[in-house]
Curated annotation (Swiss-Prot):
CDD domains: PLDc_CLS_1 (cd09110), PLDc_CLS_2 (cd09112), TM_PBP2 (cd06261). It comes from the Bacteria. The active site is at 222, 224, 229, 400, 402, 407. GO terms for biological process: cardiolipin biosynthetic process; sporulation; transmembrane transport. It comes from Bacillus subtilis (strain 168). The keyword Transmembrane helix applies. This is Major cardiolipin synthase ClsA. NCBIfam families: bac_cardiolipin (TIGR04265). Keywords: Cell membrane, Lipid biosynthesis, Lipid metabolism, Membrane, Phospholipid biosynthesis, Phospholipid metabolism, Repeat, Transferase, Transmembrane, Transmembrane helix.
Amino acid sequence: MSISSILLSLFFILNILLAIIVIFKERRDASASWAWLLVLFFIPVLGFILYLLFGHNLRRKHLFQWEDRKKIGIERLLKHQLEDLETKQFQFNNRATFDNKDLIYMLIMNNHAVFTEDNSVDVITDGRDKFQRLLSDISKAKDHIHLQYYIYKGDELGKKLRDALIQKAKEGVQVRVLYDELGSRTLRKKFFKELREAGGHVEVFFPSKLRPINLRLNYRNHRKLVIIDGMTGYVGGFNVGDEYLGLNPKFGYWRDTHIRLQGTAVHAIQTRFILDWNQASHHHTLTYIPNHFPDYGPKGNVGMQIVTSGPDSEWEQIKNGYIKMISNAKRSILIQTPYFIPDASLLDALRIACLSGIDVNIMIPNKPDHAFVYWATLSYIGDLLKAGATVYIYDNGFIHAKTIVVDDEIASVGTANIDVRSFRLNFEVNAFIYDITIAKKLVSTFKEDLLVSRKFTYEEYLQRPLWIRIKESVSRLLSPIL
């Protein structure tokens, strides 16, 4: 027997073993199991490699044992809220919070997402505005700057932000930068050399320990967080790069949604950053530092919870929050998302809302940045069009916003897309906002986006050509592993 025959036989045996693992050991979602079995069957050698990189379920194993809030900062507030829930003494100060108390309860109990009502929130929908504000806040920093992004590019915007951080580090401000290795794969280590020399610290999330193989490649930190002096925070969809200023000809204008906030909710963002930082850092880990959690009094009256999820989570908290919002809807649901690949539970919740007479509106991009994801999105959109949803295609560039608004009362803004990757594999963060004024601001933004969007009807969907139907079918089949 030739060497090639032996190798083929070996790969065939390994494929069978992997199939057994996929079916019996991993205990994954049935649709994901079938998708991986198809990959292993049709492309046995490449499929084996892809499974090692993207398919092996490392969820909630020793890989993710870094969750420890007790020495970080919000444990005391969380303890009081859990006690108030048990004794039914929890208080709400406005209609939006009272009407959604079951959602607030769920996120406190299952995500330890502390609820605060002393926040001010600014909604930002333009990249130039976002980074102008961020650079202004950085220039005023006195104690520390904590910055975390999935994508950080070494282009003009990346350099401008880096140089601002270098200046603050030279002034004695503590600067910490955390970026994801895969998302920021074009960034060279020397890019932050001067920042390190100025006293700043830079860490990489889940770097490859054995290049080019990284068994944690499938689990990426998709969070975008900035905390300045423990008083001002940013969270949302914008990464760092010129394309987010609308300078990439492929995408054109980049429409995203970010929020700038002040208030006790910043402490929750700070806690999340420190937990992620301590996982990535081996020499500069952080414990509780009073300056990271200053007591500066109320900044507003916006109710809010900072909700995180990831492969270290027991529950898919952000997805569960979405489902609860949708299930509680009485009048309307507005969704903006670049990718729409819901699992069965979320799809059913939206379908039931449509069939119950709720006005469900969904806005998606007119162009793909990931082809398979785009075609899978159209497939699921077809299901909801049939159920009565209204769908809009954004035509003024690329819409990357991840927002949900329900009944013009509550909203979610953050990093999580409506897809399986965001719900189960990526580390994500969303702000759940219980405030009519902020909700109406997001509704107004949605209406402004309608002016540069076109309605996508069910009749139009039914008339799509055969080649698009084939693309959709294949992409949907693979959607659980995209």
